[in-house]
Each structure stands twice: as structure tokens, then as C-alpha cells.
């Protein structure tokens, strides 16, 4: 059975790069009827926080990336890492190193001065010296001194690294906490991970991890290293490119299915398909369709995708999503006589890019907005006064339907010898405080007769003054 995993470090929020890695691992497992495992690599004691762990869990839940096992925490598995380290020590495949930080710094400085690559020189590898008192040693792997490591990356192809390029990496630190390379290998082995799908910033770690597995006589998983994500300027993705946390996109009013769709298309493709469901992603997903070149993050494309999903979203769902945004804007959407929020969503959803914009566009349905003086000056003209007063009379008694409202606007314009916009635009500004809205008869129909007339009367003083 195929088993994949996502193993973030809880030192920050779930960002775009991590979310895409999680999505690819999730999709591959789901495609093949396998298992998707979540593991929290919390061995960075200074930077790991419970808040970051929760942010990762929340981000995955919002994106719908459900896991079959976990979350497992590395700090709860220390005894297991010690057990394996002891096994390697007994076999002579690992050793204690008593070098101080100062010694290591001096060693690297000398190597740089000699034009050499800084690396551990193996001085404790076969040492028979008496260990210095009071020093907590690290445990190092006896990396092979010759030969090479070759593995087939499912995205990048065959990769070969000479063992002479690798030094004796640390397995356990002096405080007994495993290093990244050791912990991840033991976890993947114990959890029977068959496919390690991760960012290509881990490619250089792979030969080291393979040598640990070989020392243990353990089977190797298959590796797939996903190219990094760049900003539009070709630089590594950072906050200045809009690479905020996944949950920030929720706060900004993006739909999770739009972000999932966008993340999937960042470096992976299925023909020319731009928009596809989660089910289609699982059906089509294959590692062979991941591009070897870095993907470029395009906020405008993400916004466009979100707009497409908003257009077809269920109105009741949109109404629930928009409520917190409207409440933050001082709108009561539950009071008696307020417009049906679902109908408001239906009227507005094709005009916006995000839930936040949808809320902004809906505000005037739930509280009056005072028109800017420039709008009053532009539209509250002497020419409009007569038809507006006439329309006010008509609106007080007609059947409150969109077509009847439209007919009344047209009739008032005709009766006063002006074109329809000369009536519709002042009316729009009076009632909504805006110059751009959906068809004004549709707006008035949802707003209701009583509220429409109240708002008109409030603005009529500017015509009559």
C-alpha cells in the first residue's frame, strides 16, 4: 500500500509552499487508495510552538486535507531515536564525537582559509583518546568514505552524489534530541512511508538519509522532490510576493476549493484544464506531470480562480461566509425587514473576486451609506428633481417587483423628457450611496419599499434645498 506523509515543523504558519507539498502528498495517497500520514517535526525546541502546530492543523482542515494517521510528534518519540542510535553505536556504524562548538568553528575556519569545503573532519571517528570530562557528546554516523549514493527521484530523475562529498552527520545532539536527518529517517521507516514527497530544498539531505537507512539495513522509500515556488520576479517566494499563511487567505475571503485548485496548478498540470474539482484532481494526479522547473506564484491568477468559484458557489453557503465580514462592518443581517442575504449573494457574486469584496458590495443593503458630496453634485441636478419626485410617488403604490420598478423609472423619465439614466443614476446614489451597483430595480426589489422610500426621503432634501 502506498503511504505518504506531510511533516511540517511548527515554527510558523502553514504557508503556500508547505500547503502545496501537503496537497501533492495527499492527492497521491488518495489517487492510489493509500494512506496519508501527518507528522509534526517539533525538535526545534526554541522555535516550535503550540500556536504554530494549531495553525498548521487549522490550515489543513480548511483546505480539506484529511489525514489517515497522526498527528505524530517527534518529541514524543525520543526513546525510539535513542534506541536506534544505540543500535548503530553497538554495530560500529556510529560513534560519539566530543568536539566543542569552538573546536568545530576553528576547524571550519581553517578549512575555508585553505580553500576547502567546510566539513567535519572525522577526528573522533576512530579515536582512542580519553573523552574529555564534562562534555556531552553528539552521536555521528560513520558515513562511507568511498563509493556513491544513487537514487531515482520521481520528478528530477537519477541523482548521484559521491560519499566523499558527505561528512559524518550528527544523529543525536548533546541534549539527546535527534537532528532533522535522523528523526525523519526513523519516522519514515517506522511509519512505513513508501513515497517521500517534499520540497526540493531537501534534495541534498536525501543521500545522507539513504546512508542512514543503508546502515540500518532498511528498505528505501521512493523520493519525489517538488521544485520550489518563485515570485513573479523569479526570486524565491516570500511575504513581499503575497506568500502569506494559508489562513490569511481565508481571512481575505478566498474559498478553500479555489486555493486548492490554484496550489495544484503550481507546477502540476493535466492538459489545459484550469478549473477542476477535488475529485478530478485525485483522479488525474500523477507525479510524472509535475514540472521540473520552479513554479511562479501569481496572485492575480489565484484571484481569478476564486472569482470563478464564487460565481457558481451556493448562495446559502456564501451567506454564511459573508456574515462575519458584514458584522465587522457594522451590519445586522438578522434584523426584521432586512433583505434576504441569499438573494443579495446571488445578485452580487458575479461582480466580486473575494468574500471580503462581496461583503463590501453588500453593505448598503443592510445600512444606509451617505453619498459622497461629489456624487451629489454630479447626479442631484435640477433636471433630475422632477422625475425623482414623480418616481417617489409611483414607488409608494406600485407592485413591488423588479419589472414594475423598472417600468416606473422608465415612465418617470419619459414623462419629463429625459433619458432613463438621468433618473436611474440619481436614484442609485440616493438609495445605495454608490455610483456602481447591479441593476437598480433589482437592488430596490431586495431592499424593500419601506427602506427604499426612507432613503429617498433622506436625500430629497438635497434636491429641495
UniProtKB/Swiss-Prot annotation:
Q: Where does ATP bind?
A: 239
Give the domain of life.
Bacteria
Name any Gene Ontology BP term: glutamyl-tRNA aminoacylation
Please tell me one Gene Ontology term that the record gives under cellular component.
cytosol
Q: In chain numbering, where does the motif 'KMSKS' region fall?
A: 236-240
List the molecular function annotations (GO) for this entry.
ATP binding; glutamate-tRNA ligase activity; tRNA binding; zinc ion binding
The subcellular location is: Cytoplasm
Query: Motif 'HIGH' region: which residue numbers?
Result: 8-18
The protein's UniProt keywords, in alphabetical order, are: Aminoacyl-tRNA synthetase, ATP-binding, Cytoplasm, Ligase, Nucleotide-binding, Protein biosynthesis
Q: Does the keyword Cytoplasm apply?
A: yes
Q: Which Pfam families match?
A: Anticodon_2, tRNA-synt_1c
Q: What is its EC number?
A: 6.1.1.17
So what does this thing catalyse?
tRNA(Glu) + L-glutamate + ATP = L-glutamyl-tRNA(Glu) + AMP + diphosphate
Matching HAMAP family: Glu_tRNA_synth_type1
Assembly: Monomer.
The UniProt entry's sequence similarity note says:
Belongs to the class-I aminoacyl-tRNA synthetase family. Glutamate--tRNA ligase type 1 subfamily.
The protein's matches in PANTHER family, at most eight in alphabetical order, are given as: GLUTAMATE--TRNA LIGASE, GLUTAMATE--TRNA LIGASE, MITOCHONDRIAL-RELATED
Q: What's the stated role of this polypeptide?
A: Catalyzes the attachment of glutamate to tRNA(Glu) in a two-step reaction: glutamate is first activated by ATP to form Glu-AMP and then transferred to the acceptor end of tRNA(Glu).
What is the protein's given name?
Glutamate--tRNA ligase
Amino acid at each position: 500500500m502506498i503511504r505518504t506523509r506531510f511533516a511540517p515543523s511548527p515554527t510558523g504558519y502553514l504557508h503556500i509552499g508547505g500547503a502545496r507539498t501537503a496537497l501533492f502528498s495527499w492527492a497521491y495517497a488518495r489517487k492510489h487508495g493509500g494512506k496519508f500520514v501527518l507528522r509534526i517535526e517539533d525538535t526545534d525546541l526554541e522555535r516550535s510552538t503550540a500556536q504554530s502546530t494549531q495553525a498548521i492543523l487549522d490550515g489543513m482542515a480548511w483546505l480539506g486535507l484529511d489525514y489517515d494517521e497522526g498527528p505524530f510528534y517527534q518529541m514524543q518519540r525520543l526513546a525510539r531515536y535513542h534506541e536506534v542510535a544505540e543500535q548503530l553505536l553497538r554495530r560500529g556504524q556510529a560513534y560519539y564525537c566530543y568536539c566543542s562548538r569552538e573546536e568545530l568553528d576553528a576547524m571550519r575556519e581553517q578549512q575555508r582559509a585553505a580553500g576547502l569545503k567546510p566539513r567535519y573532519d572525522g577526528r573522533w571517528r576512530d579515536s582512542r583518546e580519553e573523552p574529555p570530562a564534562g562534555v556531552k557528546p553528539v552521536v555521528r554516523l560513520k558515513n562511507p568514505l568511498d563509493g556513491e549514493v544513487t537514487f531515482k527521484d520521481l520528478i528530477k530523475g537519477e541523482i548521484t552524489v559521491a560519499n566523499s562529498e558527505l561528512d559524518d552527520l550528527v544523529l543525536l545532539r548533546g541534549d539527546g534530541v535527534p537532528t532533522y536527518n535522523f528523526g525523519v529517517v526513523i519516522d519514515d521507516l517506522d511509519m512505513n512511508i513508501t513515497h517521500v514527497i517534499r520540497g526540493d530544498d531537501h534534495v541534498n539531505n536525501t543521500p545522507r538519509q539513504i546512508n542512514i537507512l543503508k546502515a540500518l539495513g532498511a528498505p528505501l522509500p521512493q523520493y519525489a522532490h517538488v521544485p520550489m515556488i518563485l515570485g513573479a520576479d523569479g526570486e524565491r517566494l516570500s511575504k513581499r510576493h503575497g506568500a502569506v499563511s494559508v489562513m490569511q487567505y481565508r481571512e481575505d475571503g478566498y474559498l478553500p476549493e479555489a486555493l486548492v485548485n490554484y496550489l495544484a496548478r503550481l507546477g502540476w498540470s493535466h492538459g489545459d484544464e484550469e478549473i477542476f474539482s477535488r475529485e478530478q484532481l485525485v483522479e488525474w494526479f500523477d507525479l510524472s506531470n509535475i514540472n521540473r522547473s520552479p513554479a511562479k506564484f501569481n496572485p492575480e491568477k489565484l484571484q481569478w480562480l476564486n472569482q470563478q468559484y464564487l460565481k457558481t458557489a451556493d448562495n446559502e453557503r456564501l451567506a454564511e461566509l459573508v456574515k462575519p465580514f458584514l458584522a465587522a462592518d457594522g451590519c445586522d443581517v438578522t434584523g426584521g425587514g432586512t433583505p434576504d442575504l441569499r438573494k443579495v449573494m446571488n445578485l452580487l457574486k458575479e461582480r466580486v473576486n473575494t468574500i471580503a469584496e462581496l461583503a463590501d458590495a453588500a453593505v448598503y443593503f443592510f445600512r444606509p451609506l451617505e453619498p459622497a458630496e461629489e456624487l451629489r453634485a454630479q447626479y442631484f441636478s435640477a433636471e433630475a428633481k422632477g422625475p425623482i419626485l414623480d418616481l417617489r410617488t409611483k414607488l409608494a403604490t406600485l407592485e413591488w417587483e423588479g419589472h414594475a420598478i423598472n417600468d416606473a423609472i422608465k415612465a418617470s423619465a419619459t414623462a419629463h423628457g429625459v433619458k432613463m439614466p438621468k433618473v436611474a443614476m440619481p436614484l442609485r446614489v440616493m438609495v445605495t450611496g454608490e455610483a456602481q451597483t447591479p441593476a437598480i430595480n433589482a437592488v430596490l426589489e431586495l431592499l424593500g419599499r419601506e427602506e427604499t422610500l426612507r432613503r429617498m426621503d433622506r436625500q430629497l432634501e438635497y434636491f429641495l434645498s
